[in-house]
C-alpha cells in the first residue's frame, strides 16, 4: 500500500515564509533562550497584572533572585520544583527562576485533591513546592508524606497595585489563608524568599538533553504520568513557533491567554511569549469574562490563546462583541474541539480567517499541527503538521499507514516530541514504536495534507462491532438549531454483553424547553443524519 504521508502533501499548504524544514535549531537552554528579551527590551512591559505593569528588567531580576533562593535551599540542576499556582506574577518569576537554576519545572493543578497532590509530589520527587496561602490547608495534609523540604507561599495580592491590594483586603475580595510552620519543612512567603537575594544571573550550566519540564498527563492509558520534556524540546519548539507564525521581532506583541502555567499549553506558550519579548496580560480568573473584555479593550492584545469553551462564552457577551479586533492577528484555539459552525459564528464577530485551530499533546511540547497563519484555514481542521514535524496515520492493529481519507491513529516524530514518561518503562514501550510516538488520537487527512480529528481511540464506542466516534456524533448534534452543547459516551448494552450503545447528554439553547417532544425531535434529526447504530 502506498504511504501517502511520505510525500508530505501538507508542504504545498505552507505559508510562503515557512520553509519545508528547519536545519538550524538553537543549541541553548530554556533560560538562555530568554536572554534576548531580557537584554533587548528591558523597559518593555512583560506582565500586566490587574493594572500593575512589570517590566522585563524587573522580571529578570525577580527570577534571578528566585533562582538564587532555590540554590540556597540545596536545589541543584535536575531537581524538581512544583508550581501549584494560577497565573500571577510570582508564578512567572518562579517558573523562569526554576529554569535559571537548572531545575525541572512541574506544573500542578490547583484543582487537585489532597490525595492527587500527594501522588504528583511523590511521583515527581519534588523538593520545593510553591502554593497559594488559600491552598495551604490542603498542602499541609500531605506535604509531610513527600520529599518536599521547602514550601513557598504566594498571595493573590502579591504585586497588585497598592490601591487594589488595600481595597481588596478590606472588602475581602482577595482569597487568602493562614500559614504556619510545619515539622521538618521550611515555610516561607515568596516575598521573603527573594528578599535580599543577589540580582545577578545564576551561573548554572545545563545541556540540551537535560530535563526542563515534567508535565503530568493521562498519557494514552492509566494514571497521570510525568512527561519529561528536555531543554532541546522546548527551545526547538520555540524555533518552530517563530518560524510558523512569522513573529520574529522582539518586543512587538501583546498576548492574552487564560491557559494556566500548570497546563502544558499555557506553560509553553508563556515561555514562547517571554522569549519573544511579548507583553502578557495575566488572566488569573478565566471565569471573569468582564475583566477579560476590559483588559482587551485597554491593552489591545495582538494574539489570544484560549480553549473553545471560553470563546463560546465570550461570544455571548455584549462587551466582547463591541471590541475592535482589527489589531488581533489570530485567535489560537486548542485543547478541545471547536465545532465548525461555532467557528463560523465566532469569525463573524472577530474577522474572517482569524481562528487558528491547533492540535497537540503534553508529550509534544505541545503542538503537532496548526492551521497556516496566512494561508488556507479549513474550518473544522486542526491544520497541517508544523514545520520540522513528521506525521502519519496508521491502522492501530497493524501499524501500517492508512489510505488517504481513512481514519487512523496519529503517530508523530519531531524535535518537540518528549523522551518518555518519568519512571514508566512499560508505558514508554507502548507509546514509542519504531521511533514514532503513538498519540492515541484518531484523525483523517485530506489531499491537501490537512488533518481532521475524529476521536480518541479510547473514546470510540463499539456497537455490535461497528466503531462510532463520539466526536462525530457531538458535531452533528451541535448542528441542530436547538442544541447548545453535547457530549457523547458509550455505555454497556444490557441486551448485548460486550457491546455498547451510544448515549448523549445535551444542553438546550436558552428558551428551548426540555420535553419529550423536543427529545423526539432531536432523535428524528439524528436518524436522518447518521446510521442507525450511531443514533444516541
Task: Please identify what each model-predicted range represents.
Residues 8-15, 32-55:
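AMP-dependent adenylate-forming
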Residues 26, 43-82, 86-88, 95-96, ...:
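Conserved AMP-binding/adenylate-forming core of the ANL superfamily
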Residues 72-73, 100-192:
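Structural core segment of the AMP-binding/adenylate-forming
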Residues 73-75, 197-209, 214-256, 268, ...:
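Conserved adenylate-forming
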Residues 112, 129-131, 414, 419-420, ...:
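AMP-binding/adenylate-forming catalytic core of the ANL superfamily
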Residues 235-254, 262-303, 317:
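Conserved AMP-binding/adenylation subdomain of ANL enzymes
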Residues 301-306, 317-377, 390:
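Gly/Ser/Thr-rich phosphate-binding loop
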Residues 384-388, 400-430, 468:
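Conserved ATP/PPi-binding loop(s) of AMP-dependent carboxylate-activating enzymes
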